[in-house]
Amino acid sequence: MILVVGLGNIGVEYENTRHNVGFMLIDLLLKESNFTNLTNSKFKGELFKIGSSLLLLKPSTYMNNSGLSVKAVNDFYKCERMIVIHDDIDINLGALRFKKGGSSGGHNGLKSIDALCGNDYERVRIGVGKGENVISHVLDKFKPEEEITLSKVLEHTKKALLELIEKDDLSAISSKYSLKA
């Protein structure tokens, strides 16, 4: 099994915020796929299955406790691979980066996952830029002019993610799909 985790916060007030780009990408994948809904309270999130070996997870624990949901799914399904999609304030809106392992970079969702599951997983980092106040910036909604860039980046990221899942070659995918902004 491959587990793809999109990080975000639940609730209408968080829809279309910078912190929710992981949720947005999962929603984009679901919109274009036949899936089985495996959501169960024990998983602490929305869980979907595509085909025989791909799980998509949107934790419902809020960002700072995302690891609780990821651990519950990993413990139950014994996933061989995990890919986490998240916002990154250290890269500009429109940028896309890939990496495996390493530090959380101060991202509380990643800190939670690292604490409960370790940090040996692939990461898809979607740039959202850095505002004056980090917390309010990541919880702000995208401006209309930013939504155009975001839409293009999410579509590009979807293609990259699908190829990463299929080919399992992070270096090649990073070379082919990374974006600078």
Curated annotation (Swiss-Prot):
One of its GO terms (cellular component) is cytoplasm. Pfam families: Pept_tRNA_hydro. Its main location: cytoplasm. The record marks N9 as: Discriminates between blocked and unblocked aminoacyl-tRNA. Its EC number is 3.1.1.29. Keywords: Cytoplasm, Hydrolase, RNA-binding, tRNA-binding. This is Peptidyl-tRNA hydrolase. It comes from Campylobacter jejuni subsp. doylei (strain ATCC BAA-1458 / RM4099 / 269.97). The lineage of its organism: Bacteria, Pseudomonadati, Campylobacterota, Epsilonproteobacteria, Campylobacterales.
